[in-house]
Amino acid sequence: MTKGILGRKIGMTQVFGENGELIPVTVVEASQNVVLQKKTEEVDGYNAIQVGFEDKQAYKKGSKSNKYANKPAEGHAKKADTAPKRFIREFRNLNVDEYEVGQEVSVDTFETGDIIDVTGVSKGKGFQGAIKRHGQGRGPMAHGSHFHRAPGSVGMASDASKVFKGQKMPGRMGGNTVTVQNLEVVQVDTENSVILVKGNVPGPKKGLVEITTSIKKGNK
């Protein structure tokens, strides 16, 4: 069955394995996860739990700032006897009977050796050319060449007479939702609500990440 939790990417470090191998790991802090709602097949058409992460400030009349919860969000969180949450996600394909509304989801949901998928928003790189953005090759840099880092041909002339949608061109790079699959949980620190994940995960430091059981290897 699927397991899931939300957290913040703290950064990277290194730990030693049992055999003395040096392992690069990403530190993810995953505290303050609370079940806000249970969804069942009878009522909602599918089974899922809705999890909230990080407290948001209570409703403030007249304020339009995102740091304050609105009244519907405050009322929704009140049913779970908790504060309004900044981030809310659903996790499906799990046994909803194991969860109760208001229950805290802690890092011990996962164990050392679990294979997981990690989803985050990739680092924004701003406007970049085709070489950095798509890995295209460059032209000769000498011998009279006038073609260095330009994209090259982007379409045909008379027949089609247009640039097709999806053509790889310069543009804004990064800031996309990215999932890295089949990463391994190296260590779970319940005292500090921290999970150590082997390798790197998407996003900058302090970026939101979603950890779920691997969709490909989780049930093996």
From Swiss-Prot:
GO cellular component, one term: cytosolic large ribosomal subunit
Keyword Hydrolase: no
Classification via Pfam families: Ribosomal_L3
GO molecular function terms noted in the UniProt entry: rRNA binding; structural constituent of ribosome
Keyword annotations from UniProtKB, A to Z: Ribonucleoprotein, Ribosomal protein, RNA-binding, rRNA-binding
Location of the region described as Disordered in the Swiss-Prot/TrEMBL record: 61-81
UniProt subunit comment: Part of the 50S ribosomal subunit. Forms a cluster with proteins L14 and L19.
Family named by the database record: Belongs to the universal ribosomal protein uL3 family.
Protein name per its UniProtKB record: Large ribosomal subunit protein uL3
Keyword RNA-binding found: yes
Domain of life, per lineage: Bacteria
Signal peptide start-end: none
Gene field: rplC
GO biological process assignments: translation
Described function: One of the primary rRNA binding proteins, it binds directly near the 3'-end of the 23S rRNA, where it nucleates assembly of the 50S subunit.
PANTHER family in alphabetical order: 50S RIBOSOMAL PROTEIN L3, LARGE RIBOSOMAL SUBUNIT PROTEIN UL3C
InterPro entries listed in its UniProt record: Ribosomal_uL3, Ribosomal_uL3_bac/org-type, Ribosomal_uL3_CS, Transl_B-barrel_sf
